[in-house]
Amino acid sequence: MFFPLNYIKLSPHRNCLEKYLKKELPKLEGSILDIGSGGRRYDYLLKIKPEAIDTKPNEAKGIKFGDANDLQCKESSFDNILCIEVLEYVKTPQKAISEIFRVLRPAGTLILSVPLMYKTHEDFLRFTADYLKELFSGFSSLEIKPIGNFYTIILDILRGKIAKLKFKPVKYIFYLPYLFLVLFIPLSRLSKDTAYISGYLITAKK
């Protein structure tokens, strides 16, 4: 269901991404490794609690230290791997994808997302569809799904500017027209133009 207020809590890009993840993640069967888990934000969509790793471990949440370029896992040890909005922070993505391929079981599923036209956030890289096809060429099947469109990119920029306003009453005043524009997001999805997108969701099979 479409809730405009969600677009204040999360960016339009994140909302579009989570719309897809809510469809895909509940389908996963078997063991799961969540790379760059952060706060285990997607556990609620999964049937099985994943093994979570991050460069910033969290003992309270059961998140161990892990590096995407050097996964301390045996070969073919997971049925599924999640890597959501992580690869842009990795300096050598080819090495990370090789490691993911190594620890994924035959016929296992990788679900990965990356931003494209999105604000800078201490990331190293951005990925086009053509580069992603080359990067995942070793997988037996690959689906690259665009996230967002021109309209959601503009809303992302507006939301970012409003969030930086320090005087709260003014901030709330600006959020009103922003939320009005958010109401047109479902209509914007009718556009088939993929020249301007905020990112990609990749589903790959080993």
Descriptions of predicted regions:
Residues R102-R105:
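Short, cationic motifs built from Arg/Lys/His that form the positively charged side of catalytic pockets
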Residues L25-P26, E75, I97, F136:
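A short, aliphatic-rich alpha-helical micro-motif
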Residues D70, E88, T120:
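Glycine-/small-residue-rich active-site loops that bind phosphorylated ligands and cofactors
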Residues M1-C73, N80, T194-Y200:
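Conserved N-terminal segment of class I S-adenosyl-L-methionine
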Residues C83-V86:
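A short beta-strand submotif of the Rossmann-like class I SAM-dependent methyltransferase core
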Residues K91-K95, E99, T109-K205:
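S-adenosyl-L-methionine-dependent methyltransferase catalytic module, highlighting the catalytic core
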